[in-house]
Amino acid sequence: MAEIKNYTLNFGPQHPAAHGVLRLVLELDGEVIQRADPHIGLLHRATEKLAETKTYIQALPYMDRLDYMSMMCNESAYCLAVEKMLGLEVPIRAKYIRVMFAEITRLLNHLLCVGAGALDCGAMTVMLYAFREREDLLDMYEAVSGARMHAAYFRPGGVYRDLPDTMARHQPNKIRSAKSTEKLNRNRDGSLLDFIDDFTQRFPTYLGEYHTLLTDNRIWKQRTVGIGVVTAERALNLGFSGPMLRGSGVAWDLRKKQPYEIYDRLDFDIPVGKTGDCYDRYLVRMEEMKQSNRIIKQCVDWLRVNPGPVITDNHKIAPPNRESMKSNMEELIHHFKLFSEGFSVPEGEAYATIEHPKGEFGIYMVSDGANKPYRMKIRPPAFVHLAALGEMGRGHMIGDAVAIIGSLDIVFGEVDR
């Protein structure tokens, strides 16, 4: 009788469902996974070491390039760590702007996660719908920072600038008629806040479309229900956080449990799953988008009636405005020193953590009193989740591994750092 042996299959790193440069070595018994061994490091760029060679301001843009789907959330943790070491108080308006854009970023991340996860399982429509909404959200990024992805909008002490009073408008061209341009511009007549407010009113309808396409879809449920189950106790032991932990039934959210910025002033709920499978994690992310929309609406309403500064007035930390710099020698010196030498941070250490769209994202910073970090350690949530892939995939089919990877929501910029 022939000896039966398992065989090994390389999944990725060029596989479209690998969500980046994941190389997964699968040991298969027929089509059933016996062992899954993730090989990482293919996108390693030494971000932590690079930060040690840059001033605190110069190191900030590297944060955007970690999880490049949740750009401003990465910046948020970095700025909180620097501010904690400086003992710096941020203006209240800047805090509201930060929270509003952190939740816009959460929408960007979850839309891509749900859309890409559905696409991996064969549902293409949701991905196309999600990119329709992401276009408006990226326009909000562009309005405040000039960039659609790597914004570098958050700064130690506040944000780069206040919200603009106008929105950029589409122009007719060879491939876009005047009629279609008018349709695209119909919600761009007012300020950025008007544009965001209009989006928050439309977004629940879009969420309803996703629910119609997926939530009760028989094929979607067959692909996700009972797949990649992680119990609440096991999720805690594995170090899960974010939607991965809440999907397993643990109501842990840093915005509620350890409030930062102004989350303690806002009204929102924390969705929690029951069984800890791919379907529960999908539902948690869908409900989180609804709650993020609520938070954005509350921030818009507050920002409309509360003008004020958006960055600290300490010019040793934040640059003076352009007008005063051009008319005042002291301000010019501040500007020159800030961008040539940076600012020095008192000797000490700080750990700042936020509720990132993927989980608990933390920055541990050590300062020796110089103008550059002595050591910066990044705690990425997806790195922890990816480590559990072997356990979650055992006993499932190859096709189920794709669904599990989609529900993990991994981005290799932050996994490999």
From Swiss-Prot:
Gene3D superfamilies: Cytochrome-c3 Hydrogenase, chain B (1.10.645.10). It comes from the Bacteria. Pfam families: Complex1_49kDa. InterPro entries: NADH_Q_OxRdtase_suD, NADH_UbQ_OxRdtase_49kDa_CS, NDH1_su_D/H, NiFe-Hase_large. Its main location: membrane. Its EC number is 7.1.1.-. Signal peptide: none annotated. It is found in: Cell inner membrane. The keyword Magnesium does not apply. GO terms for molecular function: NAD binding; NADH:ubiquinone reductase (non-electrogenic) activity; quinone binding. PANTHER family: NADH DEHYDROGENASE [UBIQUINONE] IRON-SULFUR PROTEIN 2, MITOCHONDRIAL, NADH-UBIQUINONE OXIDOREDUCTASE 49 KDA SUBUNIT. NDH-1 is composed of 14 different subunits. Subunits NuoB, C, D, E, F, and G constitute the peripheral sector of the complex. NDH-1 shuttles electrons from NADH, via FMN and iron-sulfur (Fe-S) centers, to quinones in the respiratory chain. The immediate electron acceptor for the enzyme in this species is believed to be ubiquinone. Couples the redox reaction to proton translocation (for every two electrons transferred, four hydrogen ions are translocated across the cytoplasmic membrane), and thus conserves the redox energy in a proton gradient. This is NADH-quinone oxidoreductase subunit D.
